[in-house]
Amino acid sequence: MNKMAMIDLAKLFLASKITAIEFSERICVERRRLYGVKDLSPNILNCGEELFMAAERFEPDADRANYEIDDNGLKVEVRSILEKFKL
């Protein structure tokens, strides 16, 4: 298991190597894989959780609620999260 997989996905997304939809789908899978893992650093765990929450707010449809974000909004949030955790 790659404990950095969520961070790696975020970096792939920011580099435009995967789409926002791929990021939002794959981040959920990686999050599930980390359930019960006890030796994660708090920094990685918290960053992963924030990335997951940002992905949950992503809505590709133009008809989105005011709390939902589009591709560009997701990129801004993901970049901000990685900077916050210095990753």
Swiss-Prot record:
Gene Ontology MF term list: toxic substance binding
Task: Give the GO biological process terms.
Answer: bacteriocin immunity
Judging by the UniProt lineage, the source's domain of life is: Bacteria
Keywords linked to the UniProt accession: Bacteriocin immunity, Plasmid
User: Which is a Pfam family this sequence falls into?
Assistant: Colicin_immun
Q: What does this protein do?
A: This protein is able to protect a cell, which harbors the plasmid ColD-CA23 encoding colicin D, against colicin D.
What is the name of the protein in this document?
Colicin-D immunity protein
**What organism does the record attribute this protein to?**
Escherichia coli
